[in-house]
């Protein structure tokens, strides 16, 4: 769900909720008039209109999750007929399918897939560029990031919502 400001955090852990509220409301030490911060905090307060939007969407959360899950299963079934790996939840975890991804065999396969899908009306994109490759972080220390680079060259984010019938455009292709 979205509230127009990036979403919301939901938990059934009271301690985690208290901690999250503290960090997201500037980490200010309680005091009647002084502003003292004892750690790095953020100003992520949610305006009432955004909160109302979030509350309305919460009433439909199960519906949203069912739609995302159905599409993820359609992707997984479609992709299962290929040699591409669909990224799935690990162990006993349950994915929300906000972002689906696949792993291709090479950078060349990734680029070919991106070109094919985007030119056929399904927007796909490579995973985010590594932070160490962004100008503002290029001089920061890293350990070579071998695994991250391997993934960057192969992982594609696929849509978590597509128009009905859009996946049928992609019949089996000749290898």
Segments (PLM) and residue ranges:
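Glycine-rich phosphate-binding loop of ATP-grasp-fold ATP-dependent ligases
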Residues: 4-9
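PLP-dependent aminotransferase class I/II
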Residues: 12-175
């Amino acid at each position: 769900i979205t509230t127009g400001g990036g979403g919301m955090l939901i938990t059934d852990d009271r301690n985690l909720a208290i901690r999250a509220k503290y960090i997201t409301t500037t980490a200010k030490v309680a005091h009647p008039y002084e502003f003292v911060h004892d750690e790095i905090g953020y100003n992520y307060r949610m305006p009432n209109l955004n909160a109302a939007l979030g509350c309305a969407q919460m009433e439909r959360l199960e519906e949203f999750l069912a739609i995302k899950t159905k599409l993820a299963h359609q992707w997984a079934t479609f992709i299962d007929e290929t040699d591409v790996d669909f990224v799935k939840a690990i162990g006993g975890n349950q994915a929300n399918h906000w972002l689906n991804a696949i792993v291709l065999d090479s950078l060349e396969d990734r680029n070919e897939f991106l070109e094919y899908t985007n030119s056929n009306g399904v927007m796909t994109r490579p995973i985010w560029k590594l932070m160490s490759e962004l100008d503002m972080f290029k001089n920061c220390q890293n350990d070579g990031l071998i695994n991250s680079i391997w993934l960057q060259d192969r992982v594609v984010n696929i849509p978590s919502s597509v128009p009905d019938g859009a996946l049928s455009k992609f019949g089996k292709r000749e290898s």
